[in-house]
């Protein structure tokens, strides 16, 4: 009887583990398919919630990280506002009573960008970015709740850790921590098809048109707005003391550090146009080669045959240059023909011809 019970318990444990494993696999597959899929359908307003449910959830997380980094840390460092955020800051300086409407003003300045770029970028990008901005407003409201705000101010303060002047140690610390947290949130948002809004609409359009790194384009645009902010706001503060003290050198340096950190994270998490050499080693190379031709594979590829120096047997491999974010989806297709193939990837620094970007743009 005991043996039967033990057998039953072991079976139940195995069954539960198997169910958990299958669930994890399904979730992982669904998430990867939302990031990039060869068979994805065009996203419309009607099917958006159904096709992008995981992306919506990730945008909630990404907006939380971004808001924590900016609202709690970067705000304490008092760095120069960058991007579209510089415009509501100017309004706040001129009319201090509008400070509490900063988030709404930021949304308002995004509307023209949404209208202008809507025709030229993926609809899912617009939907997810707008949703991400709404989530940012939601988290900002949460952090502004009196009890939470007091707890944050009392807990996250370097004055409790080190007796250093605010314009040195604290600015550096808040900038570094805020840059890392918000940078991860920004990268995560881009990876799942959205962004934090503002100049990201312009970044996405220019990056897609000229096939340039999103991180680099984001840095260039943000730096441009930062310089604009430094010049205009500094002049306003210089001629009218009611607008506050001019920016310090450390605040300006902190701004550039923040932008370097966030764009570094963005490039690392979402290297959209990063090219890789994918080499597939298999005993079914000709079948895979035929499958790629029949399915109208969009990149160039080559079939190589040789003799292994180790086994002295014929070796077959397929080489193709792909974009980094396409790799998982391509390997899934190859696995349908040869489940036990193996592969290697290596970075491509430059190519003589432009690679087809139709699947990722």
What are these regions (language model features)?
Residues 2-285:
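Core subunits and conserved enzymes of cellular information-processing
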Residues 2-42, 270-361:
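Peripheral (non-transmembrane) domains and long loops of multi-pass membrane proteins
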């Amino acid at each position: 009887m005991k043996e039967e019970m033990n057998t039953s318990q072991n079976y139940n444990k195995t069954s539960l583990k198997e169910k958990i494993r299958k669930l994890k696999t399904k979730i992982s597959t669904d998430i990867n398919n939302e990031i990039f899929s060869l068979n994805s359908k065009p996203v419309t307003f009607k099917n958006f919630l159904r096709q992008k449910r995981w992306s919506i959830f990730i945008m909630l997380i990404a907006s939380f990280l971004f808001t924590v980094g900016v609202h709690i840390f970067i705000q304490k460092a008092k760095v120069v506002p960058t991007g579209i955020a510089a415009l509501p800051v100017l309004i706040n300086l001129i009319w201090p009573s509008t400070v509490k409407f900063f988030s709404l003003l930021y949304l308002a300045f995004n509307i023209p960008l949404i209208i202008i770029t809507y025709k030229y970028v993926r609809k899912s990008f617009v939907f997810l970015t707008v949703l991400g901005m709404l989530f940012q407003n939601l988290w900002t409201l949460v952090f502004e709740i009196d009890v939470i705000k007091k707890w944050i101010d009392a807990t996250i303060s370097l004055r409790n850790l080190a007796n250093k002047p605010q314009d040195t140690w604290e600015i550096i610390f808040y900038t570094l921590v805020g840059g890392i947290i918000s940078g991860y949130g920004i990268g995560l948002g881009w990876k799942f098809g959205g962004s934090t809004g503002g100049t990201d609409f312009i970044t996405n359009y220019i990056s897609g048109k000229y096939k340039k790194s999103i991180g680099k384009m984001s840095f260039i645009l943000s730096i441009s707005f930062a310089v604009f902010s430094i010049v205009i706001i500094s002049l306003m503060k210089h001629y009218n003391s009611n607008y506050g003290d001019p920016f310090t050198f450390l605040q300006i340096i902190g701004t550039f550090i923040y932008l370097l950190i966030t764009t570094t994270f963005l490039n690392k998490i979402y290297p959209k146009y990063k090219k890789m050499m994918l080499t597939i080693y298999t005993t079914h190379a000709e079948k895979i080669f035929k499958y790629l031709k029949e399915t109208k594979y969009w990149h160039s590829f080559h079939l190589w045959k040789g003799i292994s120096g180790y086994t002295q047997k014929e070796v077959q491999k397929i080489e193709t240059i792909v974009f980094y974010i396409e790799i998982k989806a391509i390997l899934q297709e190859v696995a349908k023909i040869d489940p036990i193939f193996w592969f290697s990837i290596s970075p491509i620094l430059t190519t003589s011809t432009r690679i087809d970007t139709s699947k990722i743009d």
